[in-house]
Curated annotation (Swiss-Prot):
It holds the Pfam family TGF_beta. Belongs to the TGF-beta family. Residues 19-236 form a propeptide. This is Inhibin beta C chain. Disulfide bonds join 239-247, 246-316, 275-348, 279-350. Residues 1-18 form the signal peptide.
Length: 351
């Protein structure tokens, strides 16, 4: 309900701004007279609404289980060292990497049970591609240990966990270890919960076999993919001076300014940008506008233009966008890395 009211208020305010200036044929053609600073709050609200919509969130996450900065830095450093490849801009599918830190479950001297919680991301064609378990072990010098790692799942209509697969890992030194988990673990992650049980083959006289301290907290990294659309990058013309021609107006959204720096880890902000300016008839008809919240606003403004205007001119609209790479906490305090499509306006043209 609050989201709908915000959207309605935003549309109404933008429409009011444009209707005060009806000297142009297109409501998007604000030209050089558009006062950026006076509408700053309005644009920031638009940016927040767009990000939440693309992340399928009704409101910003409230962190229930904060993760220490030391654990966060360690996890990101380990992942960057083991996964060098990056998402390509021409990849047609949106990818996420979700990092879930372990909560200690039912454990004793013979075993350690770790619980990992994932938000429900299985809707909308999301596929879990890979699941990796990363943990730190500390052993006395000149010691070898064999660790049995079990994947436990809760079957439908069952109250007990079921063993679905297990892995044997030999450890001969203290340090970080990673294990690539199979389809059973991937299925568990897609259902929102994964349980791992670590059982040493022999008992060692050591108080901290598996460290779950501040900087050695075990975690699972799940790589998932969702189908998307192919985008082609084009260069745009930035607005300069007093030019009234169609151009790209740069606008930076600072996440600290809007109070989102506590749940968005990286980046510190992004260049939202928008299109403004006039479109002469001889440059009209450029294709390439893609459906987005930005486009919906412009379409509504166009519909609210003075009904008495007989001639509808060409509009200055986005013709190319690129994704926003975002690293953030979800509502379960998991770390999510994703590229949100169509967030940064790269080029503008005349519709």
């Amino acid at each position: 309900m609050a989201s709908s009211l915000l959207l309605a208020l935003l549309f109404l305010t933008l429409a009011t701004v444009v209707n005060l200036k009806t000297d142009g044929p297109c409501p998007a053609c604000w030209g050089a007279t558009f006062d950026l600073e006076s509408h700053r709050e309005l644009l920031l609200d638009l940016a927040k609404k767009s990000i939440l919509d693309k992340l399928h969130l009704s409101q910003r996450p409230i962190l229930s289980r904060p993760v220490s900065r030391e654990a966060l830095k360690t996890a990101l450093r380990r992942l960057r060292g083991t996964r060098a490849e990056t998402l390509l801009e021409h990849d047609q599918r949106q990818e996420y990497e979700i990092i879930s830190f372990a909560d200690t479950g039912l454990s004793n001297i013979n075993q350690t049970r770790l619980e990992f919680h994932f938000s429900d991301r299985t809707t909308g064609g999301v596929e879990v591609l890979q699941t990796r378990f990363m943990f730190f072990m500390q052993l006395p010098p000149n010691t070898t240990q064999t660790m049995n790692i079990r994947v436990l799942v809760l079957r439908p209509y069952d109250t007990n966990l079921t063993l679905t697969s297990q892995y044997m890992l030999q450890v001969d030194a203290s340090g970080w270890y990673q294990l690539l988990l199979g389809p059973e673990a991937q299925a568990a992650c897609s259902q929102g919960h994964l349980t791992l049980e670590l059982v040493p083959e022999s008992q060692l006289a050591h108080s901290s076999l598996i460290l779950d301290g501040v900087s050695h907290r075990p975690f699972v990294a799940a790589q998932v993919r969702v189908e998307g659309k192919h985008r082609v990058r084009r260069r745009g013309i930035n607005c300069q001076g007093l030019s009234r021609m169609c151009c790209r107006q740069e606008f930076f959204v600072d996440f600290r300014e809007i109070g989102w720096h506590d749940w968005i880890i990286q980046p510190e902000g992004y260049a939202m940008n928008f299109c403004t300016g006039q479109c002469p008839l001889h440059v009209a008809g450029m294709p390439g506008i893609s459906a987005s919240f930005h486009t919906a606003v412009l379409n509504l403004l166009k519909a609210n233009t003075d009904a008495g205007t007989a001639r509808r001119g060409s509009c200055c609209v986005p013709t190319s966008r690129r994704p926003l790479s975002l690293l953030y906490y979800d509502r379960d305090s998991n770390i999510v890395k994703t590229d949100i499509p169509d967030m940064v306006v790269e080029a503008c043209g005349c519709s």
